[in-house]
Amino acid sequence: MLMWPQPHLPTHPHLPTHPHLPTHPHLPTHPHLPTHPHLPTHPHLPTHPMMSKETRQSKLAEAKEQLTDHHPQTNPSVGTAASDTKKKKINNGTNPETTTSGGCHSPEDEQKASHQHQEALRRELEAQVHTIRILTCQKTELQMALYYSQHAVKQLEGEARDLISRLHDSWKFAGELEQALSAVATQKKKADRYIEELTKERDALSLELYRNTITDEELKEKNAKLQEKLQLVESEKSEIQLNVKELKRKLERAKLLLPQQQLQAEADHLGKELQSVSAKLQAQVEENELWNRLNQQQEEKMWRQEEKIQEWEEKIQEQEEKIREQEEKIREQEEKMRRQEEMMWEKEEKMRRQEEMMWEKEEKMRRLEEMMWEKEEKIRELEEKMHEQEKIREQEEKRQEEEKIREQEKRQEQEAKMWRQEEKIREQEEKIREQEKKMWRQEEKIHEQEKIREEEKRQEQEEMWRQEEKIREQEEIWRQKEKMHEQEKIRKQEEKVWRQEEKMHDQEEKIREQEEKMWRQEEKIREQEEKIREQEEKIREQEEMMQEQEEKMGEQEEKMQEQEKMRRQEEKIREQEEKIREQKEKIREQEEKIWEQEEKIREQEEMMQEQEEKMWEQEEKMCEQEEKMQEQEEKMRRQEEKMWEQEVRLRQQEEKMQEHQEHLEAAI
């Protein structure tokens, strides 16, 4: 069977190739293939360069068979020697019938055999024509399917480009999300630190509040006791004043009734009583003034402490509100991130499904192309067979015509025209030889041209194939690199997301552990506070017993203790204020960082600054008040000195009174 040279058809530039499926080197994939079912096949197809000798030999054999049909003497089995003997016999004038009769079959048998052979060939030709028509129909159907599949491939290429653009957008979005995640993580870390500092401040403030409440209760109790004492002192004072008035009345009555000596003795006694009473009154007045001053100072301190407590409570509430707002913002950001991650997962799933559909469609296209290639090969083989059968049919027709001519010539001329026929046959042989020579020359020229064309085509096709192979290799390498980069990026993103989620979980667990620790610490603090309260109640009971036993000493010691406590509290307040200042400086730094991120926090920072200025003003006021207290203490010292001077004067007056009484007694 002849094998026609199959040209290396170029592949379509827009047809996607699967990297794992083998492509056929001779597979026609150009979309503009002929699809008409009645296209005529060209009869003069180029012959293969290796089959030129066989075609020449077949032509020579056909010419010899024609000669044997006319003249049975020209048998191909005899060879060149039989032709030489024929020429000799003709020249010698021998009978031609002797040469034609020996070693040949009858013409009727040859005609029957030729008719049978022709009928068999016709049947084969009809069957082959039927198969060719079926194959042409299948070819048209496959070409239509190829056209539609290529159209679908173009659509899928457009969809793939859209998906690639979406992928790039999703990568950009993923990068933005990573940046947002990093920003959120930093914000969360800052918020956690800020929350820890605020919790520490809250704990310190709660302890201060607890201590201040305890001191307030103690001061209230002391104030109540002092008020009771003041009431008692006032009642005693009123009683003493009544006693003084009664004594004065008694003196006046005694002056009127009793004699002078008794009057002097009673006057002396009453004077002593008056002096003692006046001294007691002065001492009580001084004590009352001191107690009033102390009460006023304690009330002022109570008011200040209450104001500070209210301010601290307001600050704590504001900080808790800030923390809640930050937690709400973080939750909203986490929800947004989760939604965006869900959208990303959905998009990736859609992309995977679409890629799977693309792969399936490409595999179907490859299978269709392979089917087309196989059917085209079958069609080419059938066309080759058709060409061979057409040649055989032409030869048989020529033979039949020649047989008819020969039979007519045999009937008409038989022996007389044998010599002419032989001469004609010789002339025909010479012409055939000349024609064969011409055919040989033409075939050689055609073969040379075909060889040149085929070499050029082969070179062009080889160059095209090399370029296409290079392009395909580059495309495959590029695709594999892109896929590897995409997979690496996706893996990195997934690893980052998982790491961030693990970090978030770890942070949440740490926060929970810290909260549990805080709860435990608060419970411990509460237990300690309860113990302290119990101990304080016991101490109070003991102090009350001691106060009942030693009222005066206890009062003085309490005053000293109160003063020392006040000093300690003031020192603690100063230390706390210094701590608060340091914390405020830290808070300012944090607020400056947050101010760059959020405008709302700027407003809150301004409020905090205003509050801090108020605190500074309050601290300045406290300093001024302390200075005033020092001035008041100096005034008290001065008053005490004046009191000492007054006492000295009273003593001098008493001495003068005694001298005057002595003079009176001496005069009497």
From Swiss-Prot:
Start-end of Basic residues biased regions: 15-41
Protein name: Golgin subfamily A member 6-like protein 1
Annotated stretches, region: Disordered: 1-120, 323-356, 384-466, 481-591, 603-639
Disulfide bridge partners, by residue number: none
Top-level division of the source organism's lineage: Eukaryota
Compositionally biased residues, Polar residues: 73-83, 91-103
Coiled coil: 177-663
